[in-house]
Structures are given as structure tokens and as C-alpha cells.
Amino acid sequence: MHFQTLLDETIGNMTGHTAIEYFVGKEKKKVSGDAYLTHIQAMTNYLNQRMQPLEPGTWVALKAPNSIYWFGVMFALMKCGYRVMLLDAQNPHQLDEHFVTEAGVKAFITNRPTGIPGVMDVDIAEVEGVDDQEILGDPTSYPPVGDDRWADKVSFHTSGTTGTAKAYVFAASAIVGTVRNVTEYWLGNDRITERRISPNLEEHKSLLALPFRHISGFLLVVTFWHMGHCVIFPPNSGVFSIIDTCKQENIWMMFCVPAMWKGFIRIAQARYGGCGEQEFQQLLGENLKVRISSGAKLDAESVKVLLNSGIYFLNSWGMTEIGTSTMGGIDEDPSTDYVGCFYNKHKAKILLEDGTYVDNGVGELVLDGHSLYESILIGGKEVFREGPFRSGDIFKLDGQRTYFLGRCKSVIVTDSGENIYPEEIDVYFDFLNDYSSGYCTAGYQDQVTLFVSPKDYDNFEETECFAQIRKVNAGLPMNKKVTKLYAFRDPLPRTGKGEVARFQMAKVLEERTDGVKEIKMKGRNV
């Protein structure tokens, strides 16, 4: 299978209908499925000439923010035969170089030139802005590209620095299979279908506030086209723009990360004095019937509020390596750990500490199935996955019900869905070796947290050690800043290797009721 199938079943499914609505200033514009397909062909013919002498099968990076024709550029590259790597537009230059080395990327379609020697840079605005009549009307200069070259692979990358970011490759059949599986779940869920406002699915507009290069944002857009829904672009990705668009354009479904939902809750409380059904209708409109949260875990307080919002709220779980995997209504189970049931035809097992696999219980979630990633790009070559995938996440499986309990790997997932690696943050605070008997950073309550046993515990906040912590923290990127600090009178526990036992910190906090200081770093200008 090639990505022609995905195009045919998504944008091709919107012929005769509006596929996208967007804004130029305050003016709303529409793009039909027919017009989008025509523009894809024009961009394909243009790129076929522009990308010479790159051969079909070459990896090309699409590194640009969300835009109306972002998917069109991707499909045009694929129709030329190029395998596409989807990158964050904000990635630093070092990460671009990393993927050139590790993935063999030969060109970037981007809004910011990389300037990497020997690598082609193409401005995405140049591609998106081609004139359909000019390109399609000049077959001599821009020979038509047929359907005989379609690419069969796409790559998504994980968060991290140059040493941890990985490029995961998915076969076209895995992506198409996922889209079909999600559609089957969606159309078979009576709680969703009974909330339709019209027989015309085009009127059920969907607003998605995730970057398209993110596997969740990618899959949701193509899935809603697959089901016949119009996708609407807000004027910008800010929370107030999303609120205004949702209300004014009668959005029916919205997909966001937990951080965005928490923002809506705060704004509803500030504007209307509450977060009940009436307040949410005032904030987001009466047509919003279905909401989805994914990318990170919803906190218990948000779940409590959202249960009373009068809108069907779904929680979803997935990873870059597996795409989307589970989904379920937050009102279907009293546990805030509940993330629904498997619906992407994954085969799931629990790996216990003794190395045995069971169908039910608590342990590391292990998945297999066709819709997982196929390979990783390392050193310019594909290293293929062998056997099931160990997620690194602790789950409880109880029949068809799934409960996400936390991470057994060190990565911290913020409520915006971003991966933060504590080992990287530890390096910034290595001066603590001179001021303490031990320290580490870890994820605690979805926050970047510093644990330290200072030599001067009693006067810790007046010491040079604490002043240096504040100074270093102030210079860190916003997403890596420590937001909470725990100082311990007694030494921190260590592993058999003599390292601070990062994974035991949550348990240590529960057990040590004395000799612990909690210091919130927010509001300290750090």
C-alpha cells in the first residue's frame, strides 16, 4: 500500500464538500476537496522539477508550522516518491543536523532555511503559493506526475535533544489502518453519533489545536476527513483565538492537550464564575458536543470539573511509536487513571517484574500489531522493529478497560504533551554535588521537580546553594524550568549502582513526613 490510498480516502472523500475553513484577517474562506486535490497536483508537478536531482525514495523533511496546505505539500512530496519526515518547526539547527545524519534527510521544505551544506532548502511558501493554472497549463515545463511513484513510508520524531530524539517510521498501511480503525470506533460509538446536530456531516466542524507534525494531530485531521467532517483552522493557536472560533463557527468537536482544557476551565471561572454546563456553553458555544484530550494525563481536579460540563468528554492515550491506542469517556469509570479501551486493534499484554506476560494486571504495557511503527532511522539506515513494543508505561489492564498509572521510564510528560528528559536537566544542576549529599530531577505530578538533600538543610533557602539553583533555573528554557523543589534532611535513596534512585522519589515523599521542605519555584522569577 502507498499513500495514494490515504489521499483517496481523506481529501478525496471531501470532493463536492468543504474540506477546510480558515481565516484571512476577519474574512472566512473555504477550500473544497476538489480544489485541494487540484492544488496538490499542481504542487506535485512543481516539486518534481524543483527537487531535482533527488531520487524517489529519498527522505525529505517537512519542517513548518500548521498551514492550510501543509497536508497538501506532504501529499505532493509523497506523490513524487519522496518519503516524508515530519519535524517540529521550532527544532534547533543541531536537531536538523542530527536528522540529516541519522535519517539521511536530503532536503527540507521549511519556513526557515537550515543552511546545512549539501542539503536542499525549499521555502514552503514557494510551494504552497504555486499558481494551479500556470503549472497545470504548462506540461512542457512541468510534466504531469502520475500515480506510479507514490511513497510508502512516513516518519514522526520524538521530543528531546540531539542525543535522544528518534525518527520512527510508519508504513502507509499502518497509517491507513489506524484511520480506518478510528473511524470504525467513532461511527460505532452511540454516545458520539447521538450527539450529531444534522444528517450532514460537513456541518459537524472539527477544530484541532495540535501541530500536524505530532502523530495525534496528524491522525485526527486525516481521520475526520475520512469520516466527512470539515476541519476548521482558527486565526491563530492562542487559547482566546480558539475560544472565539469555537463559539462563532459552531464547532462540534475539539481536540486539545490537557493544558488547553485547564486554560478553558480557568477562563470560564474568571468570566462567568463557574465551570458548569451553562458556563461552558457561554464560553465555547452550544454546538460543541464532543471533546477529546490526549498527549498527557488529565489531573483529577480537571476531570472533576469536566464531568459537570455537559459535554461528552473522551480521554485518549497513545505514543509517537504506536499512534493512538485507547479511548473512552471520562464518565465511564470513577478512576481518573482510566483511558478507555483499545480500539486500534493492538494486541496488549502486561509485563510483570518477574518477566512473565499476563492479559490482566499491573505492569509495563507491551503492544503488538500492524499499526505500530515499523523501524527507526539510525545512521542513515532503517533498523526494523523486532517483536512487540515495550511502552515504558505502567498500566493496569482489567478486561477491556485500561488504566494509565504512570511512567516506568524517566521521561516527564508535561500537561502540554511534551516529553522532557530529566537526565538532561540534571546536568544543569551538577554544582549541587558540592552542596549536597545527592540530588536528581524527576517528574512528579506532571511537573519538573528537583529533589536534593542539602548539607545545610535548616537554612537552605538562605544559602548560596539555593541562590545558585534559582540562578540556573532562571536561565533554562521555559519547558525545562523546575517548578517544584523538595529539600530533604536525610540522604536520598540510592540504587545498587550507587546512583540516586530517581524512580523512588514519589514513594519517598509519601514515607518521609518529617525532614522535608516543599518549595514552589513558580512566582520566584525563575
Please name every model-derived segment:
Residues I412, R470-V526:
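Conserved C-terminal "lid"/linker of ANL adenylate-forming enzymes
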Residues I20-P53, A61, P65-S67, Q94-E97, ...:
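Conserved AMP-binding/adenylate-forming core of the ANL superfamily
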Residues Y46-N91, L207-L210:
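Conserved AMP-binding/adenylate-forming
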Residues V179-K205, F212-E279:
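Conserved AMP-binding/adenylation subdomain of ANL enzymes
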Residues W252-C256, R266-P334, S436:
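Gly/Ser/Thr-rich phosphate-binding loop
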Residues S32-D34, K153-W186:
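Conserved AMP-binding A3 loop
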Residues F108, G369, G392-K480:
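AMP-binding/adenylate-forming catalytic core of the ANL superfamily
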Residues C341-F342, T356-G387, R401-T402, S416-I420:
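Conserved ATP/PPi-binding loop(s) of AMP-dependent carboxylate-activating enzymes
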